[in-house]
Amino acid sequence: MNGTSPVARSKRKEPPQYSSDGRLAKHHRTNGDIDMSSADANTPTEDFDGHYEEEPRHVLPLAPGADTAEWQATIENVVRNVVSIRFCQTCSFDTDPALTSEATGFVVDAERGYILTNRHVVGSGPFWGYCIFDNHEEVDAYPVYRDPVHDFGILKFDPKAIKYMPVAALPLRPDLARVGIEIRVVGNDAGEKLSILSGVISRLDRNAPEYGDGYSDFNTCYYQASAAASGGSSGSPVVNKDGFAVALQAGGRADGASTDYFLPLDRPLRALKCLQEGKPITRGDIQCQFVLKPFDECRRLGLTPEWEAQVRKAFPKETNMLVAEIILPEGPSHKKLEEGDVLIKVNGKLLTQFIPLEETLDSSVGQTVKLMLLRGGEEVEVEIEVGDLHQITPDRFVSVSGGSFHNLSYQQARLYGVACKGVYVCEAGGSFRFDNNENGWIIQSIDQKETPDLDTFIEVMKGIPDKARVVITYKHLRDMHTLHTTVIYVDRHWAKKMKLAVRNDKTGLWDFSNLSDALPAVAPVPRKASFIQLENTSHPAVADLVKSFVHVSVTMPVKLDGFPKNRKWGMGLVIDAEKGLVIISRAIVPYDLCDITITIADSIVVEGKVVFLHPLQNYAVIQYDPKLVDAPVRSAKLSSEMISQGASTYFIGYNRIGRIVHTATTVTEMFAVTIPANSGAPRYRAVNVDAITVDTNLSGQCGSGVLVAQDGTVQALWLTYLGERNPSSHRDEEYHLGLATPTLLPVISQLQQGITPKLRLLSCEFRAIQMSQARIMGVSEEWIQKVSLVNTAHHQLFLVTKRTYERNEPAGDHLKEGDILLTLNNQLITKISELDVMYSHDYLDAVIVRNTKELHIKLPTVAADDAETDHAISFCGAILHRPHLAVRQQISKLFSEVYVSARTRGSPAYQYGLAPTNFVTHVNGKRTPDLKSFLDAVVGIPDNTYFRLKCMTFDSVPWVVTMKKNEHYFPTTELIKDPSEPLTGWRRITYEGGKKIEGEGHEGVGVAVLGEDQGEGGEGDVDGCC
């Protein structure tokens, strides 16, 4: 890269865009640049020099009449050869994240069906896509070559599939590129089907642009022009007036300048000829990056006047020389070349450009080349063995325990200046989710065994049983000085197979094979431990409460119910040590398709399972095996008396780093809380519950804890409540509030007796109103006086603000929105906790005010058994299940029982715009009212064929999407809750080729549908394949 060159950015397409609330606004998708980060498309990505990347410009095609007749004839011929490429990179690999995008290519061999485009389009990993010709004929395309370094790749299609237009090839003429020639860039600019942009080549000798942390080209020069191309133009032909392709559009600046960068066609032309002749495309390299530097810089590096004179005489028009920039440790050039060496000769020939250097290296794989250099003015001659670039370019990866791995690539090694070796984590999920980084980790060792390469890593993982906890050491490419050491939980039960994917350049697919099934878990053994002592407290009973807290870590392998995270942790309170019952927030344990790890006394680690999920009050009860715990765990004593406003209490909490903090404090308020609903993707939230706040700053720092009396009696739980997503920061709001213990006692009592609580619910949400409002709405003075006498702390009644849609609503009277509730079973309702009477009654006698009239009605309640998800389907990368309770709380009508909860990036669902919060009502015109009918309809669809889905958005807008099925990377999978399953409690069924397979299938990456932590990501969008 030139010293004065500004930062360049690739112009790549981003996935379909949706309205700010995450729901599909229209079924017409807009286009822009690919967001290369894992964050939401609205979040700016930061350049490596600290500046924010700007949105791409939307430019107009060349105005009619601006071209001569000669240009018009040329353009008419060229556009027939240009295709729009729509593609998915189906999973993260090397420098490329899983994504869906559009780009451009052009036919370079009509007889064999070869299309030239960019390497960042073809990608280094699994690719799935198709091309659309000028007459809108569509044909599948697959990669047959992607260059290890340079930004070009070649796709293959079946020419016989194009029936309605003649297919011609665009000749490649790299020799015709000249400074000052007028050119046209013909392609899919800014997502348009066809745009024609004009420009003039201004430079032929700029260094390859750097695109930051992702893929970047190097060891080649680039051309520069002012054409103002934009997203989607990647892979466009750069043609001259005679209709020859003289360069390939690759990238450009995104800071407002209309500067574009073109790849010379010398190396693409050589690769094409090799394919046409059936010869291998040899690629040689010495693991050294060279850059072009002008003579004045070379002089400062040691270029002598004598050699400068010889070079200028041999190349009169030359102004640059090649200088060593980056030399990889342990590579062929290590200890032979040094940074700043000026290259003079290769094999005795004077040389100043990349092309002759590459010609020499590509023809010398496995042989030795002799380089002559100037180092600080001294002549140095070295012999270096030329390596095979294909050998240091990964063409396989392994998926195990939720993560994906391959050998470190030359691209990554060059970017970070490290040795080209090691096991690279390309998808840091499941057991290998380190911090918040999705990739970039290098595994150093697992289970005290070093893992220098992928083969060793595979053998080590084969020997680790399911549910084992092993020590792992790793580094990040950005900081190879720091060695991280931690203990991971090896999950081999959600995805039992260790799968190897190997690139097949003949078919364009990646072939999957099973390397090994999981070893059975080792039976746990009892452990002994003691608790810490809580210091500096004058109340021993309060101090003993630390023996009732346990650390709970939850991992969710599949994203359900709109929940934005795939792992959470918090502190749970032991409510029955003999039975191992623990109570914890539902913001930590949102559903029971999960792995729960409970740590007792910071020492004993045991498994947990979900035994109860409260549908409204934001708590879950989990259980561990107490026989495995030899520690003085104490059951917390829960108060049966309601704590009151102004009462003195003791706050014990755990802060964000898991440290215990405590202080004496006062209850400041008790109120009926309304947790805002998330408009983007409905997910669990607390409803119809009283909340407590206290007068201490520690309460806002702690997501778990208790309020406790001096005698050690727990008066309230301190819980995390999941709220809405902030539209500005794209982060999920969390509220820290107290929940009084008397509310919990009926459920806990049943659980202690071994009874699973069967709750009943009123299908509505209430909001507190003041007496001034109640009077206007028709509440009589008599009732207002009763309220003032019954509840002296809060003069309030409750208004129905929202009805929950019930699938099978019982007959009888029902509350309506706007009703004011006065009594239930003859009890005046002035506290939200008094609604708890509904949990144990099939019917309730109620007095309400409706439309200013007082009514006596008999209210039926509904069973809460229907509140949790127990069946899910993964289809074409979309996760579908019945609309969960949060959906029914926010919607007035269910359009079907097939609800899109999430989707995988790089999948057909993402490519064709099947978004979370959509309902699928028909498949190919056939009604699909439930999951069974949907599954019956889609299983019979042949692979790689189109089908129609009729959908309804959350906001009742009908639309139709056409999708193409892909079973190879995204097999149809069914997850069914089954208590008889000993490991997970869920049964997995896979459908491949119309066959039903118990467990995992042969195809697809062997990891569950793992989502990123959605702190800044798109709601409902997850990474990886299933």
Swiss-Prot record:
This is Pro-apoptotic serine protease nma111. Pfam families: PDZ_1, Trypsin_2. Residues 1-51 are annotated as: Disordered. Belongs to the peptidase S1C family. Nuclear serine protease which mediates apoptosis. It comes from Neurospora crassa (strain ATCC 24698 / 74-OR23-1A / CBS 708.71 / DSM 1257 / FGSC 987). PANTHER family: PRO-APOPTOTIC SERINE PROTEASE NMA111 (PTHR46366:SF8). It comes from the Eukaryota. GO terms for cellular component: nucleus. GO terms for molecular function: serine-type endopeptidase activity. Residues 82-272 are annotated as: Serine protease. Keywords: Apoptosis, Hydrolase, Nucleus, Protease, Repeat, Serine protease.
